[in-house]
Structures are given as structure tokens and as C-alpha cells.
Amino acid sequence: GAAGGQLNFFANATAGNATLDLRGADVIGAQGGQAMFQNSASAGHSNVTVQGSQANNPGGPEGALVTFGFNASAGGASFTVEGNRFAFAGTGRVQFTEASSAANASFATLAGYDAGGRLSFEGTALSTAGAGNAHITNGSRTTASGSAGDFGGSTSFLAHSAADHASIVNDAGRTAFGAQTVFRADSAAAGATIVNAGGRAGDRGGITFFQNTS
């Protein structure tokens, strides 16, 4: 399929105060827009929108993707990570790998049609990916939306990652599982503050999972 547009920041480069609008694919089989920060690059104080897939095709088009790796930092940027527009399609994603850090950035993962935007951290045995002092809000649809079958936004801490001193809120809403934060093998909540919002009548509360050796 067709490749999406791509931005690459390397070797101490910074996005400064830019506005980055990364679009999800709207053609079946295509990739969404991508931005990559590597080798101590920083997102600066930019405003970044990471859109989910815009095409109605199960498992086909992809959402937009932002990747941080090799000591890259999200700086003080603001990220809006959207869910999919149609059932089973790809969501917007932001991922931190190796020794990258979310630093002082703010993230809002939003619910989609049936899957919300995704934020993930995964390091290696020699380098931990961390959330730094980030502010993370995993969103969920409100009861008024009438949606009862979708997943809210989510943050995942996978192998060799840590929430550090981040502030994380998992919103309540009428979704299948609510907004959620997940810790899996060899990850740690460390000194983070996590709030799981309580649901009103008909709502699902926010959820935090600790699995395996987390």
C-alpha cells in the first residue's frame, strides 16, 4: 500500500514550537503519517495531533504513528492521540523505545469508534524507556455519547519501562473496558501518581492493570 508522509528528527534536532498534524490513512492498505525522533532529538514545545485511521476497512489502513528512540525526548510537547473512526481500523499511536523519555510532555489519548489512541513504552535490558514527569490522560467516551462497545484511550508500559514520576488519569465513560493503563513484564509504576476515575450510573470506571512481573 501507499506510504504516509514522514518527518524525521535526528541528533539533537528539535521540533521547537511547531504544529505537527499527522493524519491517519484514508485509503485502504495505506499507512498513516509518521514522525520519528532519534539520537537525542526532542519534540520541543510542539503541538502534535496523531490521528487514527479514517477509512472503513477492518485491519486495513493504519493510524498515524510517532516514535521516540535512542535517548530522544518528548520535551514539553502536547500530544493528542486519537482513536479509530471506524470499527477495527488502526488508531493513532505514540511509542517510546530504548532509553527515550516522555519528559515533561502532556498526552491525551482519546476514545475511538471501537479502539482509543495508544501510548506505549518499551525499553531493553540495558536501557529503560520512561514516562518522566509527563501528564497523561487516557480518555473515554461520555455516557451522553450513547456508545457502549468501544475501548477508551490507553497507556501501556511493556518490558523494561517505568512510569517514573508521571501523573496518569484514566477517565470513566461508557466503554467496554474504560480508559486504562497497563503494566506488563518487567515494568514499574515507580513514583507515578495514577488516578482511576469512578463511573456514574451506566459508566465504566478507569482501570489500571499490573500483569506478569510488573
Functional labels for PLM-detected ranges:
Residues 1-214:
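Beta-strand-rich extracellular passenger or scaffold domains
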